[in-house]
Amino acid sequence: MTTSRRKFLLAAPALAVAASVPAFAHAQEKQLVHHVYFWLKNPSSKEDLNKLIEGISTLRPIPTVRQFRIGVPAATIKRDVIDDSYAVSLFTVIDDIKGHDVYQDHPIHLKFIEKYSYLWGKVTVYDSMDI
């Protein structure tokens, strides 16, 4: 084995760790969780549910969104503390309040509200910051 190859093989693990530091450091910053719950005006309509999910999906490209998940109530055991009366939820992670403000005023978000708000009868939002 040549000396340069041996040096490379010895240095490779350290290089991999060093390359991952910025990504890890970014993930350790305190972020904002924006969790939105939607109740349909017509809860029995599968068509309305699918339209709302389609609409929520359009929010994914907003640049300040770091994580994006759409969900429906899970079929967990019924307990007094569980509210599964909503139709769809949107879970997003955003870097900070400034990024959240960009998200709220972004043309994609405003278009979503304009185009799909006729589908929901109630929306509840829970915003929280990492501690």
Would you name each region that the model predicts?
Residues 23-47:
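C-terminal segment of N-terminal export signals and the immediately downstream linker at the start
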Residues 16-22:
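Hydrophobic h-region of N-terminal signal peptides that target proteins for export
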